[in-house]
């Protein structure tokens, strides 16, 4: 005789706690987190060039997951905290961190070419890197230039 639990024996999971925790974590997400993709990719490429395929491939897959998660979190940040996201973009301290998304995209593209031979994914990431580079360079540096209140050089 099998014992089957009744539905009232289980508490319903409160998804609002999970959603609020995600929102709180995304709110102040640093744009410089793509530096993790850069660094992981560089180590993965070095391992590949040194003939360590297990390390190289493991870091390559870790990098793909990290890259996708970071883009997902940044899209959520744009949706939920639009003004804070764009305020960070023109902030003298946090703005330059956005450039790590360019380098991270291009390093991951290099991994796709060297480790998996996937030129299509690499080309997509290269084009994305160019678009991000043009967009971020002109947005961030224009904002820095025309901003009335600029920090001093020692800040």
Feature locations, PLM:
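Beta-strand-rich domains and repeat architectures in extracellular enzymes and scaffolds
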Residues: 41, 51-52
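Physicochemical signature of membrane-embedded alpha-helices that form the seven-helix bundle of GPCRs
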Residues: 59-65, 124-131, 155
């Amino acid at each position: 005789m099998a014992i089957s639990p009744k539905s009232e024996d289980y508490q319903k999971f409160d998804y609002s706690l999970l959603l609020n925790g995600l929102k709180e974590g995304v709110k102040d997400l640093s744009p410089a987190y793509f530096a993790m993709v850069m660094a992981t990719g560089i180590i993965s490429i070095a391992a590949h060039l040194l003939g360590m395929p297990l390390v190289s491939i493991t870091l390559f897959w870790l990098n793909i997951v990290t890259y996708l998660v970071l883009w997902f979190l940044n899209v959520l940040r744009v949706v939920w905290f639009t003004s804070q996201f764009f305020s960070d973009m023109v902030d003298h301290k946090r703005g330059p961190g956005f450039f790590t998304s360019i380098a991270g995209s291009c390093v991951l593209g290099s991994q796709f070419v060297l480790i998996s031979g996937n030129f299509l994914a690499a080309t997509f990431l290269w084009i994305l890197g160019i678009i991000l580079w043009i967009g971020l360079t002109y947005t961030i540096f224009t904002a820095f230039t025309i901003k009335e209140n600029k920090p001093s050089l020692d800040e």
